[in-house]
Curated annotation (Swiss-Prot):
UniProt KW keywords: GTPase activation
Protein name: ELMO domain-containing protein 1
Organism: Homo sapiens (Human)
GO terms for biological process, alphabetical: cilium assembly; protein transport
PROSITE patterns to which the protein is assigned, alphabetical: ELMO
Amino acid sequence: MKHFLRMLIQVCLYFYCKFLWRCLKFVMRKLTGRCELQRICYNTKPGASRTMKIETSLRDSKSKLLQTSVSVHPDAIEKTIEDIMELKKINPDVNPQLGISLQACLLQIVGYRNLIADVEKLRREAYDSDNPQHEEMLLKLWKFLKPNTPLESRISKQWCEIGFQGDDPKTDFRGMGLLGLYNLQYFAERDATAAQQVLSDSLHPKCRDITKEEISKFSKAEWEKKRMDKAIGYSFAIVGINITDLAYNLLVSGALKTHFYNIAPEAPTLSHFQQTFCYLMHEFHKFWIEEDPMDIMEFNRVREKFRKRIIKQLQNPDMALCPHFAASEGLINM
């Protein structure tokens, strides 16, 4: 009974707040002579702040036209803007900038949805060793990361040198499908210097000094074992696939809207997503070294802490993950 009453109160509060919000919108329109979309465009600077407010306004509207506008085909955006202006009785000759601002926002909103679909398609496509294109991408990954070391054979223990778990990398792509390979190749090709440096660090990590306090807790045998385990390296390719999973979840959850709406003046593309992966890979490597973990068994703890830090950064509406490496030179700031 208590649960039912609690649910009933929550439902009543929801509709009450919704009613008050509609009343406020009506009063604001009468006072300013502008609809909510106009007020947002005129009072909010371009970027994530404006686009996310426009997106919320369109989705929460009682108008079917406005609700469906966030999922129209990119080619239909211009016509959709005209229909919205007509519905809101806004003269485009008197308010020419409004149409331009709304179009920019819709391009980002629709583009983000389409980007999720593109990324999901790659994630669902399994690596196929009988597919020449898949094989070519994998071999290119080796060449970009190990340009001076020829691969002796397709099935080889050499793959472990770039962080795969066995002698055939295809089994490591099961979780993220082709998306993991696409991201790794992009990083290795577009930011070769940084990728090779990260790989080198992962293979030849700095040693972690054990403090006297830590030594006192171990027996001689335990200390000798700990002394041998204190390196902080990791498997480059496996971590890259794991960071791909992180980037994917940030995208699908909507957390990356802040970043993409601030750096992509129109529709965010797969290249923007791959550049974001490069940034995350670069930052995670620095974060891993700063955290100074005892061994690879602490990976999940460090990754979760890193994820929370990125999410906190993305909660800032002005946030754009900094393009400070070669792969992101093409990013355009708004």
